Swiss-Prot record:
Annotated signal sequence range: none
Protein name per its UniProtKB record: NAD(P)H-quinone oxidoreductase subunit H
Entry membrane topology: Peripheral membrane protein
Catalysed reaction, written as an equation: a plastoquinone + NADH + (n+1) H(+)(in) = a plastoquinol + NAD(+) + n H(+)(out); a plastoquinone + NADPH + (n+1) H(+)(in) = a plastoquinol + NADP(+) + n H(+)(out)
Main location class: membrane
Single GO BP term: photosynthesis, light reaction
Oligomeric and partner information: NDH-1 can be composed of about 15 different subunits; different subcomplexes with different compositions have been identified which probably have different functions.
Keywords tagged on the record: Membrane, NAD, NADP, Plastoquinone, Quinone, Thylakoid, Translocase, Transport
Location in or out of the cell: Cellular thylakoid membrane
Organism: Prochlorococcus marinus (strain NATL2A)
Broad class of enzyme this protein falls into: translocase
């Protein structure tokens, strides 16, 4: 008796660019063989706004408000890297107090970034309840930002070459300590609700596995790299700002799957709380912007034509001239390594301003880890990468 053989034709399906689970206007052209993913082609560029060219036609103080719109979940990180590049090129020293304030803002942003990742990721895999919890905690961080900078999520415009825009208001550090005391037990609640949930673990364990060598070869960074067994964190490696003053550990796992990436981000929130508590206790006194302080001491009749006095934080001109030279500077954001390659030519605007977005690099490995996966796993794997398309497309 002959047995009938069935032959399936591959089917091409478009996910996005306006799918509710796409984490932005990302389009995936997926080739399916039944329920199995055969191929995947990401289509990006829907949010391209020419940020690098805008940077090359703006002074630094004019460009800082732009960058928080690239990655709205990591605005402080991009503000920091945009001012760090000309600072290092011009060898400008940042006061210790300003460095501590920067570290506090960056760690608050790291927690807010991971919370914004956690809620939608759990919603992608079917857990709706934590989505509402994370916004409760993020609102407290936004309240702290609003008290210090005047804005909540984006357009904080707080970082300046040589320091920060203004000092912290009276009582702000106590409020930050209260947040740390309140948020610590909330992470325990998340873990009790999520981490050992058998449905959640069976849903994502073993999904999207990335090996150690593969992560290095694809230039992954952040939780994507650390979840693959590489304990690499630029706060420890590059010793920028004042992170050497604090005691904290690098969060990393060995499995390299979606569950490992979840564990890394949960532990990073705990480590950020540890850094915040130490920074609030150890923050020194002194000026928050050395250029403003020196100008005040000199008075109106002082020599304002020198290098240190070219930058006026509250006005566009006279402004800071970026000296001749080029360098690449980087820092560890919630998504990984973000960096800026700057080339100055002794002008108020840079000759070249190249931005490296962490999620742009991390997204490149998506087609390779999707091959062989099921259709239902596409959103879980994509969600574990943590992608914001504003910074991917720039």
């Amino acid at each position: 008796m002959t047995q009938l053989e069935t032959r399936t034709e591959p089917m091409v399906v478009n996910f996005g660019p306006h799918h509710p689970s796409m984490h932005g206007v990302l389009r995936l052209v997926v080739t399916l063989d039944g329920e199995d993913v055969v191929d995947c082609e990401p289509v990006i560029g829907y949010l391209h706004r020419g940020m690098e060219k805008i940077a090359e036609n703006r002074t630094n103080v004019m460009f800082v408000p732009y960058v928080s719109r690239m990655d709205y979940a990591a605005g402080m990180f991009y503000e920091a890297i945009v001012v760090n590049a000309p600072e290092r090129l011009a060898n400008i020293k940042v006061p210790k107090r300003a460095s501590y304030i920067r570290a506090i803002m960056l760690e608050l942003n790291r927690i807010a970034n991971h919370l914004l990742w956690l809620g939608p990721f759990l919603a992608d895999v079917g857990a709706q309840t934590p989505f509402f919890y994370i916004f409760r905690e993020r609102e407290m961080i936004y309240d702290l930002w609003e008290a210090a900078t005047g804005q909540r999520l984006i357009n904080n415009n707080y970082f300046r070459i040589g320091g920060v825009a203004c000092d912290l208001p009276w009582g702000w550090l106590e409020k930050c300590k209260d947040f740390c005391d309140w948020f610590g037990p909330k992470i325990d609640e998340y873990e009790k609700l999520i981490t050992n949930n058998p449905i959640f673990r069976r849903r994502i364990e073993g999904l999207g596995v990335i090996g150690k060598e593969q992560a290095i070869n694809w230039s992954l960074s952040g939780p994507m790299l650390r979840a693959a067994g590489v304990p690499w964190d630029l706060r420890k490696v590059d010793h920028y700002e004042c992170y050497d003053d604090f005691e904290w550990d690098i969060a990393w796992e060995k499995e390299g799957d979606c569950y490992a990436r979840y564990r890394v981000r949960i532990e990073e929130m705990r480590q950020s709380l540890k850094i915040l508590r130490q920074a609030c206790e150890m923050i020194p006194g002194g000026p928050t912007e050395n250029l403003e302080a020196q100008r005040t001491v000199e008075g109106k009749k002082g020599d304002l034509s020198g290098f240190d006095y070219q930058y006026v934080a509250k006005k566009v001109a006279p402004t800071f001239k970026i000296p001749n030279g080029e360098l690449y500077t980087r820092l560890e954001s919630g998504k990984g390594e973000i960096g800026v390659f700057i080339q100055g030519n002794n002008d108020v605007t840079p000759w070249r301003f190249k931005i490296r977005a962490a999620d742009s690099n991390n997204l490149q490995i998506l087609p390779h880890i999707l091959k062989g996966a099921k259709v239902a796993d596409i959103m879980a794997i994509l969600g574990s990468i943590d992608v914001i398309m504003g910074s991917v497309d720039r």
